[in-house]
UniProtKB/Swiss-Prot annotation:
Record-annotated KH-like domain positions: 353-437
Protein residues bound to GTP 1: 10-17, 57-61, 119-122
GO biological process entries: ribosome biogenesis
Name of the protein in question: GTPase Der
Lineage: Bacteria, Bacillati, Bacillota, Bacilli, Lactobacillales
Gene: der
Organism: Limosilactobacillus fermentum (strain NBRC 3956 / LMG 18251) (Lactobacillus fermentum)
């Protein structure tokens, strides 16, 4: 199931983005930079005391054509719609402002848990000014300094106390997948077409507190799936609904709630920057990925060469998704749609594949013999052994004499050798370098 969602709201210049980056910072630093992945700080992962959660910085959703107070209200509404817990950020230097009171009133009526963070409390004298914020009616104000990291522990304790316990009954063996992509690539048509292909709809289930509709269905061969709503399709009347950044955020929510992600491209329009944003997030989240090129029926004079050229373009633009299979479909004519359930199941199985340590180390030793380890400043990298420590995605720890001696290119070489020996089509794999004690 998806992680709890924490939204950060507040008027401009109270330090929302600094707080967002401070909470996400340590988690983000763990993930090695992957060439070609464009990061977007609108949405990120956080962790506190072993509790994982996703964060939204609503201030990153731009509505510059709207009056300032209208923008603030809309951002608060987004937080209410999307979040399980809301952090409202205020600035101790300005005291309680009219804009703060407006946001507080909206949040108070929402019945969502709200944690009040009073930012820029950079010295002990400022702590006395914190008590004025009780008048917002949101409970205890937590003094923090997002720049210096002071007070974040107590605030995050309050945040995770409001996480609902996961209901064990919600877990099932169905494969959860979603169609994700920028607006107008044909996600809705694909959803309708694949349900039309399989027809046996078990139920439409209201999923999380955000009321996403997750559709359970059984494919013709008996395989069971849950299609995660990419959300936003069914919601109307919101000024922010059509913004690309909001579409990106909703796609990220669907990715977090899926085992397998189908990245949808529009064959007529080629590859856009937002496609890269969304696909990059799916890769970083460790989800299994299938690239679906929709509207293939609209390409004139299409043949095998046309398909090869488009495939080469995808491989060039999405180099970090070299493991993802590509399928060319048409929601309109239903061309190749029947392949999707089997491809989804295969990617899911590969994502959960486990390799015995003895077999893995045989492959590792062969790789070392074929391409000796690099050296730096007279010191050679020594690789001792490897073991698989997790699935979804498959994660391997490689024990070495000095992790700094393993260059990115050599780690990529070892990953390629592992992929050549074991079929991990459709799933990223993670290699963690660890010093042997």
């Amino acid at each position: 199931m998806a992680n709890p969602v924490v939204a950060i709201v507040g008027r401009p210049n109270v330090g929302k983005s600094t707080l967002f980056n401070r909470i996400a910072g340590e988690r983000i630093a763990i993930v090695e930079d992957t060439p070609g992945v464009t990061r977007d700080r609108l949405y990120a992962h956080g962790e506190w005391l072993g509790k994982n959660f996703s964060m939204i910085d609503t201030g990153g959703i731009e509505m510059s054509d709207q009056p300032l107070l209208t923008q603030i209200r809309q951002q608060a509404e987004i937080a209410i719609e999307e979040a399980d817990v809301i952090i409202m950020v205020v600035n101790v230097e300005n005291g309680v402002t009219d804009a703060d009171e407006q946001v507080a009133q909206i949040l108070y009526r929402s019945n969502k848990p709200v944690v009040l963070a009073v930012n820029k409390v950079d010295n002990p004298e400022r702590r006395l000014d914190v008590y004025d914020f009780y008048r917002l009616g949101l409970g205890e104000p937590y003094p923090v300094s997002s720049v210096h990291g002071v007070g974040l522990g107590d605030m995050l304790d309050a945040v995770i106390e409001n996480f609902a316990e996961k209901d064990a009954e919600e877990e099932d063996d169905r494969i959860r997948f979603s169609f994700i992509g920028r607006p107008n690539v044909g996600k809705s048509s694909l959803v309708n077409a694949i349900l039309g292909e399989n027809r046996v709809i078990v139920s439409d289930m209201a999923g999380t507190t955000r009321d996403a509709i997750n559709t359970q269905f059984t494919a013709k061969d008996g395989r069971e799936f849950t299609m995660v709503d990419t959300a936003g399709i069914k919601k109307k009347g919101k000024l922010y609904e059509n913004t690309e950044r909001y579409a990106l955020m909703r796609s990220m929510r669907a990715i977090d709630d899926s085992d397998v992600v189908l990245v949808v491209l529009n064959a007529e329009e080629g590859i856009r920057e937002l496609d890269k944003h969304i696909a990059g997030y799916a890769h970083e989240a460790g989800r299994a990925v299938i690239i679906v090129v929709n509207k293939w029926d609209t390409i004139p004079d299409r043949d095998q060469r046309t398909m090869t050229d488009f495939t080469n373009l995808i491989r060039h633009e999405f180099q970090y998704l070299s493991y993802a299979p590509i399928v060319f479909v048409s929601a309109k004519t239903k061309q190749r749609l029947s392949r999707l359930p089997e491809m989804i199941e295969e990617a899911y199985d590969h994502q959960h594949r486990r390799i015995q340590s003895a077999v893995l180390n045989d492959v590792l030793m062969d790789a070392l013999a074929a391409n000796p380890t690099p050296s730096s400043n007279g010191r050679r990298l020594r690789v001792y052994y490897a073991t698989q420590v997790a699935v979804a995605p498959p994660t391997f720890v490689i024990f070495v004499n000095d992790p700094d001696l393993m260059h990115f290119s050599y780690a990529r070489y070892l990953e390629n050798r592992i992929r050549a020996a074991f079929d991990f089509t459709g799933t990223p794999i993670r290699l963690i370098k660890r010093r042997r004690k």
